[in-house]
Amino acid sequence: MSYIDAFYKRDEDKVRVVERDSKGQRKFVDYDARYTFYYPDSRGKHRSIFGEQLQKVQCSTFKQFIKEQKIRSNKKLYEQDINPVFRCLEENYLGKETPKLNVVFFDIEVDFDPQRGYSTTDDPFMPITAITCYLSWSDQLVTLAVPPKTLNMSGAKMATERFENVMLFEKEADMLDAFLTLIDDADILSGWNSEGYDIPYTVGRIQKTLSSDDTRRLCFWGEKPKRRTF
């Protein structure tokens, strides 16, 4: 089993991992977090890279982990800063094959207001009018679009009928809902400047037209997207 991503849930002392099996099916697995550090002790059974004898301390909860470190605050500690995610991956996935990831490359088109100008990710006041996605696992290019105000639905269908995989919608909300369904099995969502514009703008429009909870559909484990600063 190959891992795709992992997430440390400190308040639950769990490491959550997303896997793909040999058939390409995605699975979610929870592991107990392991908290480990070492300290100098002449009776220790472990050695540092410098040859110093070390004693191993392993805890099952973060609270206990902090307590054990405080007890030995007068000693030099080793590996107390290693993320539990990395320990989990080392113990369970070392040597496993790299998975074939399901990747979506996407690009959005946004309406323009002659009075207010272009909208930004901080204030996404204009609707998304089209989304084009490339799905790596099916080798498909799919376009979802809301016809412009100057074109009715029948006219839009005539204009796009010669193109494959074009889906037309009356409302932006319906288009965004279909987009979330379309990318449900994606492991990676990417595109040109997507972190700086397309992803945060899409998140903003989902919040405005659907709901804040619907943004969870973009992430593993039902987490909400977190804005990155550059």
Regions of interest found by a model, annotated:
Residues 1-230:
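The two-metal-ion catalytic cores of nucleic-acid processing enzymes
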